[in-house]
A protein has these predicted regions:
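Glycine/proline-rich, positively charged
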Residues: 39, 95-108
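N-terminal binding-site loop/beta-alpha segment at the start of enzyme catalytic domains
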Residues: 1-85
Length: 108
């Protein structure tokens, strides 16, 4: 098994995520702020890409942040070669199997 506490060249520590064997940054970037009224889409995408360039590889979001706009922007940012560098995570709050499935479909 690889060193679970390896450090990215940027200095950001990376660890294995649970049993996945995926290495992710110990610090993540949350997506809620990416679609606030004063953050336009190009700025939101620049924020995500800058975080990735600096060694942040764990991106956290939720299907209902800013009516889905945050997730949409975070989904656009990893284009152009960035997708292979990140681990995307989203949250749902559905309390039934049907609602959880709907939210996951909406997220994808």
């Amino acid at each position: 098994m690889s060193n679970p506490d390896a450090t990215h060249p940027s200095g950001v520590p990376h660890r294995e995520l649970g049993r996945t064997r995926e290495k992710v940054s110990a610090i993540g970037l949350g997506g809620w702020h990416l679609a606030l009224p004063h953050v336009d889409e190009p700025l939101g995408i620049r924020i995500v890409r800058r975080a990735i360039d600096e060694g942040i590889t764990f991106l956290d979001n939720s299907w209902d942040y800013n009516d889905g706009a945050s997730e949409t922007r975070m989904g656009k940012a990893p284009r152009d070669g960035y997708r292979e560098k990140v681990f995307l995570m989203t949250k749902i709050d559905g309390r039934s199997k049907k609602e959880a499935a709907r939210q996951l479909d909406e997220s994808l």
